[in-house]
Regions:
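ATP-binding N-lobe of GHMP and related small-molecule kinases
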Residues: 1-99, 261
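A generic local secondary-structure boundary/capping motif
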Residues: 4-6, 33-36, 101, 140-142, ...
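DPxDG-like acidic metal-binding loop motif
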Residues: 103-126
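Alpha/beta catalytic cores of group-transfer enzymes, especially the acyltransferase/condensing modules
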Residues: 129-176
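Acyltransferase
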Residues: 177-241, 245
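Glycine-rich, charge-dense phosphate/pyrophosphate-binding loop(s)
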Residues: 230-275
Length: 275
């Protein structure tokens, strides 16, 4: 029996500042305003399908992950693509960055997997990509693993999110309601993380006190970052706003972030990279 194969990749996303916009009951309209950086390293997924009763077998290469997330992606794909339901699927997932370290890996994994399944089915690239972002956003909101990572990844580069929500939605996969803009710069990035995983995202975005602190600090910074053009001339504005946000939201003082930042700063100074 002939097997079909598809590959999907998606880079990670580093949030620099954000708000929590979850008042709507519709997950498509939930999200965040904010800014961040998309990087090339993230997740690669290879999907293999054969005709048969629908099921999914998942294998993680060199790491561990959340099997439930990938089943949720496929379940949503079943609702939109009938051909996916007539397949026995195998999914191999390779992670190039750790999970639960603030790199938006759940969003990246959902996008990569959704793309892999659809490419295996031979669906057009643009349609597949839009549907992947749409599905990934809904999975993220269902699990409270993220707010704006998917919209950010859809924009790419150094991004700002100026309207909350999924980047694509509806049967025609039209743009919105989320709006994000990005500009790209081929810049090497050094990523650092703690040995042990940090708090789950839901511990912040679902907690009323954290939600208030984060949203107030994020809204203040986005009032200026949302105005005007968005290109490399805004880099210093972005860095200054991110530092102010981390202090005003008190996130810098939580989960030993300040210690990690200090260690990174000291390492940069020793290497002669500190500005």
């Amino acid at each position: 029996m002939t097997a079909i194969l598809g590959r999907g990749t998606c880079g990670a996303h580093l949030t620099l500042l954000f708000t929590v916009e979850d008042a709507s009951a519709d997950p498509v309209e939930q999200g965040s305003l904010g800014t961040g950086i998309c990087v090339e390293d993230g997740i690669e997924a290879i999907a293999r399908g054969q005709a048969g009763e629908p099921r999914l077998s998942i294998r993680f290469i060199d790491d561990v992950g959340d099997t439930r997330l990938y089943q949720q992606v496929l379940d949503l794909l079943y609702e939109e693509v009938d051909a996916a339901k007539s397949m026995q699927w195998e999914l191999a997932v390779r992670m190039h960055l750790p999970i639960s370290q603030g790199f938006g890996m759940s969003a990246a994994g959902a996008v990569a997997a959704a793309c892999a399944f659809q490419r295996a089915l031979g669906l057009p690239h643009e349609e597949s990509l839009r549907r992947a972002f749409s599905i990934a956003h809904r999975v993220e909101r269902a699990n409270s693993t993220g707010l704006g990572d998917v919209a950010a990844l859809a924009a790419g580069g150094i991004e700002r999110r100026i309207a909350p929500g999924a980047p694509y939605s509806g049967t025609q996969l039209t743009r919105g309601p989320g709006i994000a803009q990005g500009w790209s710069e081929a810049t090497p990035v050094v990523l650092a993380w703690r040995e042990n995983p940090g708090r789950h995202t839901s511990e912040y975005i679902d907690h009323p006190d954290w939600k208030r602190l984060i949203s107030e600090a994020g809204s203040t910074q986005m009032s200026s970052l949302s105005a005007g053009g968005w290109d490399s001339s805004r880099w210093q504005d972005l860095i200054d706003s991110a530092q102010t946000f981390s202090r005003d939201s008190r996130l810098i003082d939580d989960a030993s972030r300040g210690i990690l930042v200090e260690a990174g700063t000291n390492a940069a100074e020793r290497a002669g990279f500190a500005g």
